[in-house]
UniProtKB/Swiss-Prot annotation:
Protein name: NADH-quinone oxidoreductase subunit D
Classification via InterPro entries: NADH_Q_OxRdtase_suD (IPR001135), NADH_UbQ_OxRdtase_49kDa_CS (IPR014029), NDH1_su_D/H (IPR022885), NiFe-Hase_large (IPR029014)
Catalysis performed (reactions): a quinone + NADH + 5 H(+)(in) = a quinol + NAD(+) + 4 H(+)(out)
GO cellular component: plasma membrane
PROSITE patterns for this protein: COMPLEX1_49K
Species: Polaromonas sp. (strain JS666 / ATCC BAA-500)
A Pfam family of this chain: Complex1_49kDa
Subunit composition and interactions: NDH-1 is composed of 14 different subunits. Subunits NuoB, C, D, E, F, and G constitute the peripheral sector of the complex.
Source organism, top-level taxon: Bacteria
Example of a GO MF term: NADH:ubiquinone reductase (non-electrogenic) activity
PANTHER family tied to this protein: NADH DEHYDROGENASE [UBIQUINONE] IRON-SULFUR PROTEIN 2, MITOCHONDRIAL (PTHR11993:SF10), NADH-UBIQUINONE OXIDOREDUCTASE 49 KDA SUBUNIT (PTHR11993)
Gene that produces this protein: nuoD
Amino acid sequence: MAEIKNYTLNFGPQHPAAHGVLRLVLELDGEVIQRADPHIGLLHRATEKLAESKTYIQSLPYMDRLDYVSMMSNEQAYCLAIEKLLGVDVPIRAQYIRVMYAEITRLLNHLLWLGAHGFDCGAMNILIYCFREREALFDMYEAVSGARMHAAYFRPGGVYRDLPDTMPQYRVSKIKNAKAIAALNENRQGSLLDFIDDFVAKFPRLVDEYETLLTDNRIWKQRTVGVGVVSPERALNLGFTGPMLRGSGFAWDLRKQQPYDVYDRMDFDIPVGKTGDCYDRYLVRIEEMRQSNRIIKQCIDWLRVNPGPVITSNHKVAAPDRESMKTNMEELIHHFKLFTEGFHVPEGEAYAAVEHPKGEFGIYIVSDGANKPYRLKIRPPGFPHLAAMDEMSRGHMIADAVAVIGTMDIVFGEIDR
């Protein structure tokens, strides 16, 4: 009898479930995966090298473009690393705003993950539900930074500006009449905090809607239960972090274990899985959204009653406010020097990691005392996860490879850097 050779299949980078530019070379025995070889680097933009020729402030917008669905979480790690080197104290109000926006970012990330993962596995409707909520979250980004995605809102020493007292309003147009506009503007009559508070009050019911669509859905369970199982020991050895590690039953969360900003003041739980399969990781992320909602609510309540500065008063590091810059010569000089020359960071090295929506996102900076980093290293959470693709998909069907890619929550901006 003739020997049957393994069949090789190229999956991606044009495949809609490849999440950007993933190319997988799959060795198949019939429809069963024998080996999966991920080919990366198709979105490499040399971010680490570019940062060496830019001032610390000029490199900040690059962070937004690493994991381009968790923008402010990337900025947070970068700012924390610079603040460690500078020894700058961040005002407490700025820390609360950072934590609130880090959790808004977590919701943005998890909603896109849920919509895309469901869509990849054949649940078409969940994507529309998730994008409905993402729209309100983008409005929160836009209210503080003017940008819906690449915000550059976190700055070394605090945040760029305080929360606004008004929300932008929709206006009557050719496609929307006055009645429709009034309904859209209903929760935009107050401040940004009122708008976020309104969203936080509604969100648990919306998460229940997602669970109604998927959690007990027979087809969803068939696609995810028992697929891509990773034991707790193996998850640790592979370098898993975030929901990938917690889905295997290991309660590790940097917000609890190594608190930064004001996470030590927050009351929230760490969800963990039991079996370490795609279904458990789905449940972990769903519960994470509920916990993020709790944290945002605590931040809103504190920010309402505690006014104060939102960025350090050291004008060598942070720009002075617009009004004083336009009336005071010294402030104008500070502003000009900061955005042309930047600030000089003392010699040394620092590593700062945050509990990014995808796992541990770390920034390692080596400074030689100049106004630019001597070396900047980015520790992406998705890189070790993708490295386990072969192990997680071996023995499964081709269709299960899509579920495994989805459960990793891969974005190539941060993997290829």
